Amino acid sequence: MIDQYGADALRFTLATGNAPGNDMRFSDEKVKASRNFANKLWNAARFVLMYLGNDYSYPGLPKDLAIEDKWILSKVNTLAKEVTDNLERFELGIAVAKLYDFIWDVFCDWYIEIAKIRLQSGEGADTAKAVLVYVLTDILKLLHPFMPFITEEIYQAIPHDTESIMISKWPEYDPTLSFADEEAQMEKIMDAIRAIRNRRAEMNIPPSKKSKVYVETAFADVFAVGSEFIKRLAYASDVEIADGFGDLGNTVTIVTNDAKIYIPLGDLVDFEAEAKRLQKELAAAEDKLAFINKKLDNPGFVNKAPEKVVQQNRDEAAKLTEKIANLRSSLENLGK
């Protein structure tokens, strides 16, 4: 097994299934998946090193951090705290799952892709490099107990301040690197990108087919900052942001909690199918709202349930009411 997939992959797999009272079902496929995870980390490190070059000297975190920098720094800061807490409680499986999700999704699939914009244009590249080194270093240290060989190998290749990763300082939570506002703002942008990509995938539209994207939102300043992210990651030729638009003609409409997005795709889209999708989404939202309102109209629930739970239901009802209004408006735009 070690000869085929590597010791790190085997260790990671065994830790993944580690939970008190849990008999792990071992399989080659799980070890193979861990090997693929190690490859993902290795390729991410190679990407970072490619842009650092041979003479790079880590200057420390700069002050001119962009929103995406604050977002990833805040996320890895929280990760360090949570993984440390998990390890102290011997929750190895939970710690490994958090590391896997962060490295694969948050760092590789989001931050690195967004960082490419600055690295390739040159504007803000130095800041992006410094943040990449900082986050990658913390990742390696947190992952080292589970994958000691690959983390040591990468650690030796990037700027480092100790002879071995084994004697380097363990990452600690830093309150100055907690950026809750930037995290919330990035989530709004990422939700929009996910929604656009999902809709394009449903319609089998290839990335090469770019379209202008119109974003109707009350958070224009947030989406203005993220417009370049939308262009790159949601295959937009251009992004226009406003608190309202006139008649845009035939468009595909995408609704998130924070924005209403229009994509004029012309004859690439089956508008009858789009109308059916919106009607289905509207019916589901109306059913969910009716269920929540029934609970809120019940004095027994309102008086006996924890105040926090009642408020969560009220907030959800408000969001659904707004979503329903947006969906109905979208159907009107399609003439349905």
Enumerate the predicted regions with their spans.
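Alpha-helical recognition segments enriched in aromatics with Gly/Pro capping
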Residues: M1-N22
